[in-house]
């Protein structure tokens, strides 16, 4: 059974969380845990915002939580501190998280004929580590993450590899 008609298709650019790895609940729980000491109402707002903005970087979420939900100042140091705490909560769990059902079979089949990439809002160093530990790195031409924006990553891939929009 053919999943994709790849007569014109030359490239696939994947998101990471919830697309290749079953990680959305791990991250949702970590956001709630980080903000639980502010009470149930803030935790509920944090969870709702996270679930409605899955493709946004954690730093942009932290800025929203701090400025809007808590009425607190936000700067790079605060963002980095929160991001480090968040990483400490999730990294081991992400390394143990299962792949989305069918991921490896799909990658095995299509990596032979197509160029595969990851463009994620997760920090690039974390995505690369997880992909390597799960022994998936040989399927991908490139693995990219934040602080770069997904749109910028896609533009870079198109430009460097000279792909046309109709080819992905």
Model-derived segments and spans:
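Helix-loop "lid/cap" segments that line or gate small-molecule binding pockets
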Residues: 32-36, 57-74, 130, 157
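Short beta->alpha linker loops
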Residues: 26, 57, 98, 102, ...
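Active-site neighborhood of HAD-like aspartate-dependent phosphohydrolases
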Residues: 2-48
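Metal-dependent phosphoesterase signature
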Residues: 66-104
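Short, acidic loop-to-helix structural element flanking the phosphoryl-transfer center
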Residues: 8, 88-118, 124, 128
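Short helix-capping segments at alpha-helix termini
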Residues: 37-42, 70-75, 135-139, 161-163
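Substrate-recognition "cap/lid" segment bordering the active-site pocket of phosphatases
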Residues: 96, 117, 124-168
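N-terminal polybasic phosphate/anion-binding patch
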Residues: 40, 44-56, 63, 67
